[in-house]
């Protein structure tokens, strides 16, 4: 009898087809519906990219206006959801709050069990609109601050920052945040997206699939890496009065020592990209803009030193989480909120995959090879 080939972690397995995004490891490129992600980040708003992922094409002016009006009118946090968040301890991880909030949003949605294309699109749009209120309120309550209501006169990114910090962000900060949302929006069959598709394949509802995806994203091998990057910076020590070169020298020495001790350093390497994450140059430009805006050269020094030491020792390049972590830190987000920010962006990709799965569904049920004891009698 021929032994089956086992693909641990489903490595190298093509599970299905998708028209949503294409990750090309050979050319280190990422396309959303055929468009290079770096071009979308340079020319589009996050709202336009969300529309693209869900509807296959970029919106025209009237389509964008209708979409923006819907998003802005569905931002407010329902009292039931706020109440559920308030029941959770501020000692729990924000990912637990995010998972719970999405579950409550699903339970309260009038079309919760309706998986028609129209209902799923409406639920996806509503979730995109409301989730920033969850993240912003959770950060504020952990600081002992009150909820800030959304503003319909601000776009998605500007409003997100307003609800979190209580002041209008500078245009360059809004743009950097917008870029990060676009870059995190979608990335093919990653662990959380595949989780969402598996759940959807059982004919479970959209919010159940997103809740499961959040559970997958909580793991440090998937979504927690941007938090881990900041923990590395904090372990090295962030000294605001330090020069770029001084910070680089310290961080490079830290990395050399960490690699000698065979420590796992997050923010480097990627399961798909072997020659560098295609999203990094665009996100690094956003980080550079934030370093200039806030006059924080020591952050660039820490970044450069770690990157150089890893390249020299292992020839491993950064992934998206590496520049994203310090970017969010400079904006003022608490480190533990970084992965919920990932959710805010990836809701678009997850729900696009959920709708694609529903449209051509087959229950995802792989086989396993048993390696336990042979059949035996109970004594």
UniProtKB/Swiss-Prot annotation:
It is an enzyme of class 2 (transferase). GO terms for cellular component: cytosol. Its EC number is 2.3.3.5, 2.3.3.16. Induction: By growth on propionate, but not acetate or glucose. Belongs to the citrate synthase family. This is 2-methylcitrate synthase. GO terms for biological process: carbohydrate metabolic process; propionate metabolic process, methylcitrate cycle; tricarboxylic acid cycle. CoA binds at residues 264-268. It catalyses: propanoyl-CoA + oxaloacetate + H2O = (2S,3S)-2-methylcitrate + CoA + H(+); oxaloacetate + acetyl-CoA + H2O = citrate + CoA + H(+). Homodimer. Substrate binds at residues 187, 279, 346, 365. Keywords: Transferase, Tricarboxylic acid cycle.
